[in-house]
Amino acid sequence: MADEEVQALVVDNGSGMCKAGFAGDDAPRAVFPSIVGRPRHQGVMVGMGQKDSYVGDEAQSKRGILTLKYPIEHGIVTNWDDMEKIWHHTFYNELRVAPEEHPVLLTEAPLNPKANREKMTQIMFETFNTPAMYVGIQAVLSLYASGRTTGIVLDSGDGVTHTVPIYEGYALPHAILRLDLAGRDLTDYLMKILTERGYSFTTTAEREIVRDIKEKLCYVALDFEQEMATAASSSSLEKSYELPDGQVITIGNERFRCPEALFQPSFLGMESAGVHETTFNSIMKCDVDIRKDLYANTVLSGGTTMFPGIADRMQKEITALAPSTMKIKIVAPPERKYSVWIGGSILASLSTFQQMWISKQEYDESGPGIVHRKCF
């Protein structure tokens, strides 16, 4: 470990996308979908080199002949064989490194079950023979990336949304809340409301198109009712989008109705509180003495917080819920889509962090349980 030139690898495994690269870099080298595809039928063309599984972009492009699986659901790994394939692809195909030569920092969802952390640790040391590894909580890494050690992180990705209060670098588990409403649900909802407008999007290929429409054209309204009125009375909010086949579609109030579901989950038929209320509830579960620090350091993280207008709307909604004298600050770093990875990159390259790695030797002596003693 004394060798300065050995770069650590940082891998952030999200439900939708896997972000991977080298510690010390300011952005991940590889970003690809967290999917594993297996051929639906036995290959007819013998000797055509048909593989028994495909990962990431290759699985995406061959999806017509494959059955696609997402090994990470709602932020938690549910299929370890496929997860191993994703890690293998990350090291050997994307980063082109030998994992036995680099320490590896992995990320995990808040409240990840203990058995899961142990399994990650075991696979890294036993399957990939890494010299050292560490598991960091995603929201905590995002907070580090924003230059803070205290604050509350609203982390919303493709599969799950969490509100995570953090005090002096430690997540407060009793106050973490999870909302099973994230990017994938918003894409599905946009597919549904575009269908109501007369456009049909149903296949997985079409879902990707809708995801692109969502990312390019959707925004969060500051005042939903007022925005609906504006949309009804004029065409100023309408935008057009060209489909791959050249057809041009027009999208109006769908642009802000789609992400409004984050604030009003009832749009999706869910009874849960919206992201603003969930953030407030999380803060209220914390000790009264630290709430002020959380309100003033509310950090947005993850791809689903990338909608224009979301920070202003959060500011407005939380101001309405909080005590009237409270100073509220919503922090929305421009690179927040990758802030978990960036936080991992920063952490793994700190000189003070080097004693925090779990080494192969420690693992051999203590077994997978070592992860609970060294990563918290």
From Swiss-Prot:
Gene3D superfamilies: 3.30.420.40, Actin, Chain A, domain 4. Keywords: ATP-binding, Cytoplasm, Cytoskeleton, Hydrolase, Nucleotide-binding. It comes from the Eukaryota. It is found in: Cytoplasm, Cytoskeleton. It catalyses: ATP + H2O = ADP + phosphate + H(+). GO terms for molecular function: ATP binding; hydrolase activity. Actins are highly conserved proteins that are involved in various types of cell motility and are ubiquitously expressed in all eukaryotic cells. Pfam families: Actin. Its main location: cytoplasm. This is Actin-2. Its EC number is 3.6.4.-. One of its GO terms (cellular component) is cytoskeleton. It comes from Schistosoma mansoni (Blood fluke). Belongs to the actin family.
